[in-house]
Swiss-Prot record:
Family: Belongs to the DadA oxidoreductase family.
Keywords associated with the record: FAD, Flavoprotein, Oxidoreductase
Name the record gives this protein: D-amino acid dehydrogenase
GO CC annotations on file: cytoplasm; plasma membrane
SUPFAM superfamilies per the UniProt record, alphabetical: FAD-linked reductases, C-terminal domain, FAD/NAD(P)-binding domain
UniProt function note: Oxidative deamination of D-amino acids.
Species annotation: Neisseria meningitidis serogroup C (strain 053442)
Top-level class of the enzyme under EC nomenclature: oxidoreductase
């Protein structure tokens, strides 16, 4: 079949790869100048297969209210003037029950663990370099009350068989030697040995080249203006400069999936949750992180690439704007300087923001729509990198009419239409 993929971030390019592997004739279009230019550009770099957790959880509403009054809040809410922002928040609050949390957690772990397996197969097949490190994630807690609050998440790790180890402050330095200098600031730690790290943008750029070798065609600077259909099937996708026909269409447009597909009267429950990152050069390897350190107090991740440190996190609900407030930069700089003061050069750091496509239940939208030939692979929130290959393989199998290797029927848009 001729398959048109909308979006050239990690979700779209990964989908193109598996569709081409399945023998389809694949075309990818994107409004940007190249691949991985938006949400995939400078994310935190974590491949967090083990600590895949819904935002919507019991106790989150209370926590969110407290965070709003912190000097460096991990969550920030700014009214964007739309009724939809309120509707989305209400849907998220409805998912903050124990029952919904367990259902959503199971779905997310299922996709993430499958994605881990897809990464294993992919690396064996291609040997691609994307500065991957398989040295786990270290979550640090600065206060005892944070440890107590995390007990529910730790119980879920136990239930799903995700390997972990509780650590005393001094034991954290076994995995991150540079933290030996600051153990007095740590109450305890949690190590997830099966997690990994990697540069999402580098991965997507290299995968783009592999896709081209398989015959996938890419068209950039293509802003979608119209989608023509007959009520049952998509006929053409029109941009400002071209017209694309296909037997099947895959939407992997992240936050913009909702706005682009609104013309089809499809109501995708996706809201743009803004995140920030700093990227700085390593100046002292002994003083830098080895893998990823997740600071529970600030909800900030510090990740090591080969010669760079990526500091990313926070969540801001403020619509589609991507301004770079100095206050957010200060938060990221504070955390990395507090834990790894000798690791990198903040004066040379680049500051970035991106929009995460979040659903109210934190689970992506994967699979069919009411249009026979329109499929979704979007809405991954903060886990688009982690879930990328697993979601893409599921999407390619569904488009191809194959049975998926894991359950996928509860991942489609229909769960919001029941």
């Amino acid at each position: 079949m001729k398959v048109l993929v909308l979006g050239a971030g990690v979700a779209g390019v990964s989908s193109a790869w598996y569709l081409a592997e399945a023998g389809h004739e694949v075309t990818v279009i994107d409004r940007a100048e190249g691949v991985a230019m938006e949400t995939s550009f400078a994310n935190a770099g974590q491949l967090s297969y083990g600590y895949t957790t819904p935002w919507a959880a019991p106790g989150i509403p209370t926590k969110a209210l407290k965070w709003l009054f912190k000097s460096h809040p991990p969550l920030l809410f700014r009214p964007d003037g739309s009724l939809y922002q309120i509707e989305w928040l209400w849907q998220m609050l409805q998912n903050c029950t124990a029952a919904h949390y367990q259902t959503n957690k199971e779905r997310m772990v299922r996709i993430s663990e499958y994605s881990r397996e897809m990464f294993r197969r992919f690396e064996a097949q291609t040997g691609m370099n994307f500065e991957e490190r398989k040295k786990g994630t270290l979550q640090i807690f600065r206060q005892t009350k944070e440890v107590e609050a995390a007990e529910q998440d730790i119980a879920v790790l136990e239930r799903y068989g995700v390997p972990y180890r509780r650590l005393k402050p001094e034991e954290c330095a076994e995995f991150e030697p540079a933290l030996a200098r600051v153990t007095a600031k740590i109450a305890s730690g949690l190590h997830l040995p099966a997690d990994a790290t990697g540069d999402c943008r580098l991965f997507t750029e290299n995968l783009y080249k592999l896709c081209q070798e398989k015959g996938v065609r890419f068209h950039f600077n293509q802003t979608i203006s119209r989608i023509d259909h007959n009520g049952l099937r998509i006929k053409t996708v029109e941009t400002e400069t071209g017209r694309f026909e296909a037997d099947a269409v895959v939407c992997a447009l992240g936050c913009f999936s909702r706005t682009v597909l609104a013309q089809l009267d499809l109501n995708l429950p996706i809201y743009p949750v803004k995140g920030y990152s700093l990227t700085l050069p390593v100046t002292n390897s002994d003083g830098a992180p080895v893998s990823t350190v997740l600071d529970e107090s600030y909800k900030v991740a510090i990740t090591r690439f080969d010669n760079r440190i990526r500091v990313g996190g926070m969540a801001e609900l403020s619509g589609y704007e991507i301004k770079l407030p100095e206050k957010r930069r200060e938060t990221l700089a504070l955390v990395v300087n507090d834990l790894f003061p000798e690791g990198g050069d903040l004066s040379q750091a680049s500051f970035w923001s991106g929009l995460r496509p979040m659903t109210p239940d934190s689970t992506p939208l994967i699979g069919r729509t009411r249009f026979d030939n329109l499929f979704l692979n979007t809405g991954h929130g903060t886990l688009g990198w982690t879930m990328s290959l697993g979601s893409a393989k599921l999407t390619a199998d569904i488009v191809s009419g194959k049975d998926t290797e894991i359950r996928s029927d509860d991942l489609s848009l229909s769960r919001y239409q029941a």
